Amino acid sequence: MPTMPKSLFWARTDTAGAEHALLDDRDGLTARGVAVSVDPIACTCRYQLTTGPDWTVRRLEVEAEGAGWQRSIRLEPAGDRWRVTTSEQGNLDAALRAAGHPPAGLPGTDEPDRLADAVDVDLGGSPLFNTLPVRRLRLASAAPDTTHRITVAWVLVPSLAVVPVEQVYTALGAGRVRFASGTFTTDLDVDPDGWVLRYPGLAERVPGR
């Protein structure tokens, strides 16, 4: 496994948790990351992400694991659709019910054709994935009010269910990008390379030491 030249670390601000990503963004993006969180149940989420030089997604692999259960998913574009492969062991729904939460259902999707319009992928709770459209659309250096409406394949955590979601990104200038999805809107602080510094209500980047 090749070493990575960059390391980014975020602390969750909405719950106990953190994310550490190792990456190489010199020619597109290759990233490996680990996110841990206690909400809705204690969970470790590992991912591997690869894009092309234009920052379009080539492959995403995610593994989520908690006490008594484990799930994985792989997403790959295949022509005009997405190939979705999943596996699961144990019983996530039982763990969720024991913690007072509703069941999660199955990982992946029964209708992969619903993802046909998705250009990017998004992983629930991870600020790294907001950088994909920011870099692909060059929003960190775009003129203020430059707006792009996109569809993403959103991977929910811990279920690893995948749903198509419409998102809107708007350049605000001075290292800020507005992110909106449904009724939710927030202004992301990003560095000159488009990596998230602060995602209000979710996470803040911790400087490397």
Predicted regions and their residues:
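N-terminal ordered "arm"
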Residues: 2-53, 57
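Solvent-exposed helix/loop surface patches that form functional interfaces
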Residues: 2-26, 77, 81-174
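Short solvent-exposed loop/turn micro-motifs enriched in small/polar/acidic residues
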Residues: 15-16, 42-44, 67-68, 162, ...
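Beta-turn initiation residues at beta-strand->coil junctions
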Residues: 35-36, 61-65, 86-88, 180-182, ...
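C-terminal structured interaction module
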Residues: 177-209
